[in-house]
Amino acid sequence: MNAPAEPLVRYHVDRAVATLTLDSPRNRNALSAALVAELEQGLADAAKDPSVRAVVLTHTGNTFCAGADLSEATDGDPTANPRRLVAAMRAIVELPKPVVARVDGHVRAGGLGLVGACDLAVAGPKGTFAFTEVRLGLAPAAISLALLPRLDPRGAARWYLTGSVFDSAEAQRIGLLTEAADDTAAALEPLLEALRLASPQGLAETKRLVTADVLRTFSRDGESMVAQSALLFGSDEAREGMRAFLERRPPTWAE
């Protein structure tokens, strides 16, 4: 008899805080169908547990999330991956409890969408960030639903268009993070203590206020961003970009 598969997202509750830990280091916590399903289940469990006041989203290993699982990118329905990502981000935004990202590693592409969907976000000195889509023949379409309502426009343009890596201090400056910290545990604790003092109703209704613009963006642009992502993933340039990435070589257009 086969042993049950190890969870890709671990769920733990302590002192009114549910911690969801992305735990698939073999593929850098890439957004596979299985990982996203477990993430959404964890969020649903936290939503229905009256003892949970807030959720922390964190990771094992040196990568918070590498973005899409490229091994699944061309299987079946081309809209499946972006639709899955949009659903996961929206589940975070719509959860009637604050979600706090705790990052101390690399965040790429779709992983930035998860951070952007969170209400608060803290990253440590090992945090690095990059919108790598532009170097793969893609665009950060789906993740923009959660990110563009929150980011400084000039900062978004710089990092979206260059695909370059930036650190936690810059991520805080452009509005991706609440705090860039030397010690994420120390930075997180006063935030969580404050959330524990707040009423469940107060948190839910206040979160509804501060996420209203983000949710309007999801409702207005969600389907078009899914369609754009699917179209780009199926393009010749994106196929070359992803092939080059997997083969660890420059794409044909790189100068």
Write out the residue ranges for each language-model feature.
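Terminal peptide-recognition signature
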Residues: L20, S24, L39, L57, ...
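Glycine- (often His-adjacent) and acidic-residue-rich active-site loop
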Residues: S51, H59-A91, V107, T217
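Short helix- or helix-capping micro-motifs
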Residues: A66-A68, G155-S164
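Glycine-rich beta-to-alpha active-site loop
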Residues: A91-L136
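Active-site-proximal glycine-rich helix-loop-beta segment
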Residues: G110-A121, P125-K126, I143-S144, S168-E170, ...
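Conserved CoA-thioester-binding segment of acyl-CoA-metabolizing enzymes
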Residues: M1-T60, E189
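C-terminal long alpha-helix characteristic of the crotonase
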Residues: V122-G127, L177-E223, A230-L231, D236, ...
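Hydrophobic, secondary-structure "cap" segments at the distal end of domains
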Residues: S144-R154
